[in-house]
Amino acid sequence: MGKIVFMFPGQGAQYVGMGKDFYDSFACSKEIFDKANEVLDIDVKKLCFEENEDINITEYTQAAMVTASVAILKKIEEMGLKPDLTAGLSLGEYCALVASDVMSFEDAVKVVRQRGILMQDTVPAGEGAMSAVLGMKKEAIEAVLPDVEGIVTIANYNCPGQIVISGESKAVAEAGEALKEAGAKRVLPLKVSGPFHSPMLKPAGEKLLDVLVDVEVNDPKVPYVSNTRSEERRVGKE
């Protein structure tokens, strides 16, 4: 049998109803949602299961995403499946850290709750945006962006043929039109409320250090891949 990787989604993959089947069907998954409601100042179950607009607002999305992902993880673990490696796209790295036992679920969900608040406060909803650019090489994108007025930059190299741009809402929209004119097959606005992975959020990252300093961090029982370094990590405190 080949090696198994547990990979977790990032912000933008959220939807109303996520995790509800697991909550209704499995005690181990229900326990995760119940724990989230106990340790946070928001009703995560209501956020995930009932129709609402808050699920797409950063300060709420991140805690909801991590809760739903870990709820599914716990059932997979209960089935006896074990990973050889864990990884996560952006926010999903926190779920990977839980899966690798680097931090507890309770700590992770509290950290991402504060992370979401800091990010939202730094760039209020509507002022920043992201779009996925399909069918265009990074060199071509890099040639277009400097001519756009405002802040817009490449944020994620998702895979060959799919690159994400991020920045001020107006600049991202203008860049999208310019990129389509320059040959991009499609430019798709992402379902996020902020300019993630852009210089606009640097102040939020600096403030998050004050939150992380009190978190207990362990060496991983399962290696995980760092988003920052794009390499396998076997030490927790780095």
Predicted regions and their residues:
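FabD-like malonyl-/acyl-CoA
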Residues: 2-141, 186, 190
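Alpha/beta catalytic cores of group-transfer enzymes, especially the acyltransferase/condensing modules
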Residues: 11-13, 40, 100-234
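Positively charged, low-complexity/disordered segments
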Residues: 236-238
